[in-house]
A protein has these predicted regions:
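Short hydrophobic alpha-helical runs that function as membrane-insertion/retention elements
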Residues: 91-94, 111-112
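Active-site-proximal, substrate-binding regions of enzyme catalytic domains
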Residues: 1-90, 97, 105, 154
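Acidic, PIN/NYN-like endoribonuclease modules and their adjacent C-terminal/linker elements
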Residues: 41-42, 100-162
């Protein structure tokens, strides 16, 4: 089971790889705040995201999300997924450093998109070569990734292919 945030959904939608989430997790959950954040007409990947949400359980935003957002200095959508993951003791898939830092203070285990790619390559969902191509595509489409992290992930993916 996984709770997904827009920071992971959007880049995966840009490169047509939302299926990596459903291939890795049996149950996918998020909040209305996140759904509304990503379903924006005229934006790249919106149609793919809309179809993806057919298989996602979308929960109401937790009552205390606004208070947590205010106290932690994060967006309400970010607080909503942290609280949802915390409540169900679930993994949070996100790609936002600030959100991940706050989530960890709440005891929530977090994966980044790069972690998902590594998991998919290890399990054979994609080959290591395909995962490297996806990594390149993500960065090429605008996903922020430090060059050092890119090099480390690319190296690990290459080792999986050996």
């Amino acid at each position: 089971m996984v709770v997904v945030d827009s920071s992971a959904l959007i880049p995966l939608a840009w490169v047509g790889r939302l299926g990596l989430i459903s291939a890795t997790f049996d149950e996918i959950r998020t909040t209305k705040e996140v759904r509304e954040e990503v379903l924006v007409e005229g934006k790249l990947g919106t149609a793919a995201l809309d179809a993806f949400f057919d298989a996602v359980t979308v929960h109401e935003t937790p009552d205390d999300a606004e208070q947590v957002a205010s106290m932690e200095g994060i967006a309400v959508a970010d607080a909503s997924v942290i609280l949802l993951a915390e409540d169900g003791e679930e993994l949070l898939l996100a790609n936002d450093r600030g959100l991940i830092e706050v989530a960890r203070t709440h005891g929530v285990e977090c994966w980044r998109v790069t972690t998902l790619l590594l998991k998919c390559a290890k399990e054979g969902t994609v080959t290591s070569e395909e995962a490297i191509d996806v990594l390149y595509d993500l960065v090429d489409e605008g996903m922020n990734l430090h060059p050092k992290v890119y090099a480390q992930v690319q190296k690990k993916l290459g080792e999986l292919g050996d």
